[in-house]
Structures are given as C-alpha cells and as structure tokens.
A protein has these predicted regions:
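Amphipathic alpha-helical oligomerization/scaffolding segments
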Residues: 1-51, 282-284
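Core catalytic lobe of class I
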Residues: 48-253, 257-260
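Asp-based, Mg2+/Mn2+-dependent phosphohydrolase catalytic module
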Residues: 215, 252, 273-284
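Conserved SAM-binding loop
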Residues: 263-266
Length: 284
C-alpha cells in the first residue's frame, strides 16, 4: 500500500489484497473436501484442469493428436507492464517476453501445438499488431495453413491511448486462426468481428482477461461441442469456463507463481450460479 499514488489507488489495492486472500481460502477449502456429489465432481474436474506450471515443462506430457482446438494468448512482448502501469492498471504476476526472444518463443509454442492437435484441428493465437509478420510466419513454418485476415475483438467502449494528442484510442484486439489438415469452420459465413464489452473491472482478475461470453462465441465458431481444447497460457481461466459452457473438455497451464489466478478461477468454479459461467451477469 505504501506504493499507492493516492488514497483511491490504496483502496483499490487493499480491495484486491482482501479478495485474493478470500479466494485462496475458498479454493483451499473446496479442494480439501473428500466426499463430492456429482455436481461437485464436475467442479473438481474443472478445478483440476487448471495446471500451475510452465507450459514448456508440462506440455511434453500431453499426448500427440488429442486436441481439436488450441487457444493461445501468449505474452505480447510489448512491455505490457509498462503500458498498464501508465494507465494505473495492476499487472502483478504477469510475465512478458523479451522482444529478441519472441520469434523462438512463438515457434516453440506453435510446434508443440501442432503436435498435440488432431489430424484436423484449429489454433487460435492472439497477438500484438506489431508482431503480425512474425506470428504468421511462425505458424506457417511449423505446418499450419493460416488465414491471413485476423479475427477482431471489437470493444464498444471509449478505448485507451497513452498519447491522445497523437494516437487514436484503441478498441480492438486481434487473433490469427490457422488449421491443421482439412478442418472447416462450424459457423460458416460468420464475419470476423466479435463485438463484446471487456470483462467488468469489478470482477476482472487478470490484466488480459477476456469475457467468457466472447470466448464461448469464438470456440463454437471453430469446433463442435464435445471437443477438447488446450490453453497454453490460462491467465484467468475464462477459456476453460467458456468451453465448459458449450460441452467441451479443456485443460491448460499458467506460471502463476503464487496461485493468485488459479485461486480466482477455482473460486469462480465453486461459486457458479445458474446454468452457465458468465462474465457480465456477475455484476448484476
């Protein structure tokens, strides 16, 4: 709290500290239970699908050709921490990649992704605009057939910019999608714009968190219910919750050294209300 710039920021930091502690206690209590109902067994499976650890260390245990889709939201190598700090957004626990290491990092991730995909499958990869050539080239080098026009998340908000006098406020993020084999889209004819508000700040647990509702839409654009998804960099874990909403099985990894994000994820699973996980309804 001593690092807070003002009283308002100190209150936000204290709130986050308190919430993190409560989520950690909730996660520990749930995972310690011995007798589980069927619904609780499903929750336990979802909790266990979030593995804490380095993707590069753990992916070797994933068998070949077992996944229908892989959703990759890697570090962007754009000094996100510096950008978010300038915008007073806390990025504690976020790990970035040095620009000089990024091409090799990408190719290693894509090589493993190609291995664990079935003979026909999709990879979805989010990226920073300045890395478009490198991301596309790395996907193609390992064998993927890449659609050269990205998909776009369009946020109907005011947007963000650090230099309003010279730069327009950004309201879009983008992903490349590529296929292995002869896989086809499930929502054929759908356009490449996904119009969704960001996850509400009051419930957001990760600096790059994407709304569950949007991830559900994206997943069902590419694969049918019942498929399996791997998420190399889980963050908030919302992709796994979106997958569960549409009857998909999923698993993934995150470094998350202090279990902050995994505890928040487990807390969401344990305290699920209604038939589906959601980002937006949590605020109502």
């Amino acid at each position: 709290l001593a690092q807070a710039k003002n009283a308002s920021e100190a209150k936000r930091m204290l709130y986050k500290i308190t919430r993190n502690a409560e989520e950690a206690r909730s996660a520990e209590a749930f995972e310690a239970e011995e007798s589980l109902s069927n619904a609780e067994s499903v929750k336990r499976r979802l909790c266990n699908s979030y593995a804490r650890g380095d993707f590069f260390d753990l992916v070797s245990d994933v068998p070949d050709a077992g996944c229908n889709v892989i959703e990759i939201d890697p570090p962007y190598a754009i000094n996100l921490q510096g950008i978010k700090e300038a915008e007073s957004i806390i990025t504690e626990g976020y790990t970035d990649i040095a620009p000089e290491d990024y091409p090799l990092f990408l190719e290693t991730v894509f090589t493993e992704s190609y291995r664990v995909l079935m003979s026909s499958g999709w990879v979805i990869c989010w990226f920073g605009f300045q890395w478009y050539p490198e991301v596309r080239a790395a996907l193609e080098r390992v064998g993927f057939s890449v659609c050269h026009i990205p998909g776009f998340w369009v946020k109907p908000t005011q947007g963000q910019t650090r230099s309003p006098e010279t730069r327009l406020a950004g309201v879009v993020e983008c992903f490349l999608y590529a296929r292995k084999g002869k896989e086809v889209l499930r929502k054929q004819g759908r356009n490449n714009l996904f119009l969704y508000h960001p996850a509400p700040p009051s419930t957001k647990v990760h600096p790059t968190e994407r709304p569950i509702e949007m991830m559900e839409d994206i997943l069902t654009t590419f694969v049918v219910p019942g498929g399996q998804i791997m998420v190399p960099f889980l963050g908030s874990g919302n992709t796994l919750l979106a997958a569960a909403n549409v009857g998909m099985r999923g698993f993934g990894f995150d470094l998350d050294a202090d279990d902050k994000y995994r505890n928040a994820y487990v807390n969401r699973v344990v305290n699920k209300k209604g038939d589906k996980f959601t980002s937006y309804a949590e605020t109502t």
